[in-house]
Design a protein with these regions (language model features):
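A short, structured surface patch at a secondary-structure boundary
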Residues: 76-134, 174-177
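Positions in alpha-helical segments
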Residues: 15, 30, 43, 82-86, ...
Length: 216
């Protein structure tokens, strides 16, 4: 019931008040991006959605405006991240425009993070399972270490989320996300304990795609 109908209703009931509450923050962030560097306010990129359908995600631009490889790895302290971009990334404010993706049904508040289309070629069985639900602004892997996890570990968490999806699980992840934003992802690093039959597959797939926290 929750998976087929309640989750979408939950997204709308929670997302609409959030959009109204953070509107001043969105306007301030847009102004900072525009004033600090030349280029568009938003970074727009094609990502994988439910059942492998592609859609456009929106984020506040946090880097200097120039062409770069789509899979270039961008870590904290990167020289091309702007001053305002550093703070937008630190407190995840750069992700706020994805609230619009949630309202139009491309994303959910909670779910596997939307991946680049090219990454589907790297997926193991867990990676493919993450495509069974709408991608989320936050998810189980994001509150379990995120960039400090290997790709197979992230996919494992995503697959576990899809398997055990519930209202309580979504509410718990949202609450944990607040703690992660305030305290940092590294403090919440938690290595998954895979089922024995999954171990060999996970080890074989341990060289997943590069991290895609880039050009945002």
């Amino acid at each position: 019931m929750y998976r087929s109908f309640g989750k979408r209703l939950f997204d709308l009931l929670v997302c609409l008040p959030i959009v109204l509450a953070v509107s001043p923050v969105l306007l301030l962030a847009a102004a900072l991006v525009k004033l600090e560097s030349r280029g568009p306010v938003f970074f727009v990129q094609e990502r994988l959605g439910r059942y492998g359908r592609t859609f456009l995600t929106y984020k506040f631009r946090t880097m200097t405006h120039r062409k770069r490889e789509a899979t270039a790895e961008i870590l904290p302290g990167h020289s091309e991240v702007t001053r305002s971009g550093h703070w937008l990334r630190r407190f995840k404010i750069d992700e706020f425009p994805q609230l619009l993706n949630i309202l139009n049904g491309d994303m959910s508040l909670v779910g596997p993070r939307p991946a680049l289309p090219d990454h589907i070629n790297e997926y193991n069985e867990d990676g493919l399972k993450r495509l069974l639900e709408r991608p989320g602004m936050t998810g189980l892997s994001q509150v379990s270490g995120n960039i400090y996890l290997s790709w197979p570990d992230r996919w494992f968490y995503d697959a576990q989320y899809v398997k055990r999806l519930s209202l309580l699980k979504d509410a718990t992840i949202i609450i944990k996300t607040v703690a992660v934003v305030l305290l940092g992802e590294e403090r919440f690093l938690k290595k998954p304990h895979a089922d024995p039959e999954q171990t060999s597959e996970t080890e074989a797939a341990n060289s997943g795609p590069h991290d895609h926290r880039h050009a945002a």
